[in-house]
């Protein structure tokens, strides 16, 4: 699986076991992602951040 990084033109191949792409948003500003990459478990959320995930190449 390949996931986008925060810079739109950059992407990376995910290591074994991390087979989801994610975008992390601040809950207070939920329109602009602050981090992107590979993740193993989804969804994750807290009081400050939320994760939006998908499982196809460069879908984040």
From Swiss-Prot:
Coiled coil: none annotated. PROSITE patterns: SNAKE_TOXIN. Its main location: secreted. Gene3D superfamilies: CD59. One of its GO terms (cellular component) is other organism cell membrane. The record marks 24, 26 as: Important for cytolytic activity. It is found in: Secreted; Target cell membrane. It comes from the Eukaryota. Disulfide bonds join 3-21, 14-38, 42-53, 54-59. GO terms for molecular function: toxin activity. Expressed by the venom gland. Keywords: Cardiotoxin, Cytolysis, Disulfide bond, Membrane, Secreted, Target cell membrane, Target membrane, Toxin. GO terms for biological process: killing of cells of another organism. Pfam families: Toxin_cobra-type. Belongs to the three-finger toxin family. Short-chain subfamily. Type IA cytotoxin sub-subfamily. Monomer in solution; Homodimer and oligomer in the presence of negatively charged lipids forming a pore with a size ranging between 20 and 30 Angstroms. Shows cytolytic activity on many different cells by forming pore in lipid membranes. In vivo, increases heart rate or kills the animal by cardiac arrest. In addition, it binds to heparin with high affinity, interacts with Kv channel-interacting protein 1 (KCNIP1) in a calcium-independent manner, and binds to integrin alpha-V/beta-3 (ITGAV/ITGB3) with moderate affinity. This is Cytotoxin 1. The lineage of its organism: Eukaryota, Metazoa, Chordata, Craniata, Vertebrata.
